[in-house]
């Protein structure tokens, strides 16, 4: 059933209908459309369009339809309705007859779809926040279990300074906490109801839009009808949050893919999140992580696509805005799936402590400690940096770690070096000295774990 037609003397070309119809993707707004219609029916009672008895009849029919949709959502796609609004209204008329045709009084599909989409966004943000916090908790638990797993930290993919696997986990907890904050912040701005704004100029009925917003669970009603039906900032904000969040998950995946390689060998992934090769029997491929990394691109694309769609649109509603849904649905679905998958990867991951320790002892990751030692002896840092660089070259030439160079050889580079240098070059000393807030010392890592646990309770 089309919601328009009196103005037209010819039926739409079937090819145009297929091009124009949106039911194949906006069917996902069915529950929100029904909930919004119930609230609108209540508002129509307050302005005398519906009697209380008529409203009760409509609400009962809409609630039956809601349960039917939840039980068998696939029925929607069996229809040739133009969009979810047409489908819901058609089903309502099937149930209550002519009374169903009164429901759309004073309402436009413009404010209707804007309301539906905001309700869907609120529901989905709630799911994303839950999944985000679950992944944070999984990372904190993994950190707690691996506080003593010393491994190399990297810059430029070159071994730089020793860290712990726990410290690495906590870095991603910080990223996810910012993602959580972005979602909560976006939720505040989208939590305003556009229902009652009509096509663009507002409704002609003196409906209390604040009361209507409250019935739908919104914090308040929007202030400008023209903006309300044109606004898709919340779509951009959520796509932006998803794009940033997926960058974090992609980096997480890339790190673990590297840690899992035979060349690094720091971790072993569970069989539950890996797959084999159709040809090479020995292979155990990190497919879950590679898919997380790969799916990042499609989310970035959704954000870019939506910004390009909106950038040249005049006020108010334009059909271009129908393009807001597919990219948003896919991006937030993808982000949610990847959050769940990242948590599953951590469930069963094995950290290979001996190999991590061995790698941390290689690559002259304690060179900075030797420079700091020289500074403590009164050598300016820039000079100390040069001295240690020369010492590293000699250690490489001999195929030894710095701590294995005899004292007399170290003293060739600086006479201030003494026997007390050797304890400072140990891995544990490297960690212990990083005791400022946010550092990798065992005390700081333990405090960070406790803080994260308290925040996530």
UniProtKB/Swiss-Prot annotation:
Catalytic activity: 2-(N(omega)-L-arginino)succinate = fumarate + L-arginine
Pathway: Amino-acid biosynthesis; L-arginine biosynthesis; L-arginine from L-ornithine and carbamoyl phosphate: step 3/3
Protein's cellular compartments: Cytoplasm
GO CC annotation: cytosol
Pfam families: ASL_C2, Lyase_1
UniProtKB keywords: Amino-acid biosynthesis, Arginine biosynthesis, Cytoplasm, Lyase
Enzyme class, UniProt record, top EC level: lyase
BP-aspect Gene Ontology terms: arginine biosynthetic process via ornithine; L-arginine biosynthetic process
Chief place where the protein resides: cytoplasm
SUPFAM superfamilies: L-aspartase-like
EC annotation from Swiss-Prot or TrEMBL: 4.3.2.1
Sequence similarity: Belongs to the lyase 1 family. Argininosuccinate lyase subfamily.
Name by which UniProt lists this protein: Argininosuccinate lyase
Gene that this polypeptide is encoded by: argH
């Amino acid at each position: 059933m089309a919601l328009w037609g009196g103005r037209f003397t010819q039926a739409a070309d079937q090819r145009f209908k297929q091009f124009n119809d949106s039911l194949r993707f906006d069917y996902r707004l069915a529950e929100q459309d029904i909930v919004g219609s119930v609230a609108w029916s209540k508002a129509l009672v307050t302005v005398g369009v519906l009697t209380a008895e008529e409203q009760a009849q409509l609400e009962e029919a809409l609630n039956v339809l809601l349960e039917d949709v939840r039980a068998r959502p696939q029925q929607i796609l069996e229809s040739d309705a133009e969009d979810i609004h047409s489908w819901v209204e058609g089903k309502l008329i099937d149930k209550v007859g002519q009374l169903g045709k009164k429901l759309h009084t004073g309402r436009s599909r413009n404010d209707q779809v804007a309301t539906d989409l905001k309700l869907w966004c609120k529901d989905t943000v709630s799911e994303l926040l839950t999944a985000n916090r679950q992944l944070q908790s999984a990372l904190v638990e993994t950190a707690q279990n691996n506080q003593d797993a010393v491994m190399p930290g990297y810059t430029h993919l070159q071994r730089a300074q020793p860290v712990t696997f726990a410290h690495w986990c906590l870095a991603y907890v910080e990223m996810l906490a910012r993602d959580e904050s972005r979602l909560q912040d976006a939720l505040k701005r989208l939590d305003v109801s556009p229902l009652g704004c009509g096509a663009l100029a507002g409704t002609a009925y003196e409906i209390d839009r604040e009361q209507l917003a409250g019935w739908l669970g919104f914090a308040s009603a929007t202030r400008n009808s023209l903006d309300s039906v044109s606004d898709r900032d919340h779509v951009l904000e959520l796509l932006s949050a998803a794009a940033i969040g997926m960058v974090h998950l992609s980096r997480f995946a890339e790190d673990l893919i590297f840690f899992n390689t035979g060349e690094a060998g720091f971790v072993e992934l569970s069989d539950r999140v890996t797959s084999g090769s159709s040809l090479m029997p020995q292979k155990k491929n990190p497919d879950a992580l590679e898919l997380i990394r790969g799916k990042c691109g499609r989310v970035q694309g959704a954000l870019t696509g939506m910004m390009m769609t909106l950038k040249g649109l005049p006020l108010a509603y334009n059909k271009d805005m129908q393009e807001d849904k597919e990219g948003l649905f896919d991006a937030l679905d993808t982000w949610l799936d990847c959050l769940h998958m990242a948590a599953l990867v951590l469930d069963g991951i094995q950290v290979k402590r001996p190999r991590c320790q061995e790698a941390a002892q290689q690559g002259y990751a304690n060179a900075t400690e030797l420079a700091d030692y020289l500074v403590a002896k009164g050598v300016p840092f820039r000079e100390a940096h040069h001295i240690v660089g020369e010492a590293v070259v000699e250690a490489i030439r001999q195929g030894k770690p710095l701590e294995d160079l005899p004292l007399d050889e170290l003293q060739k580079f600086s006479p201030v070096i003494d026997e007390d240098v050797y304890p400072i070059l140990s891995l544990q000393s490297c960690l212990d000295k990083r005791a400022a807030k946010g550092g990798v010392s065992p005390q700081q890592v333990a405090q960070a774990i406790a803080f994260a646990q308290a925040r996530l309770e």
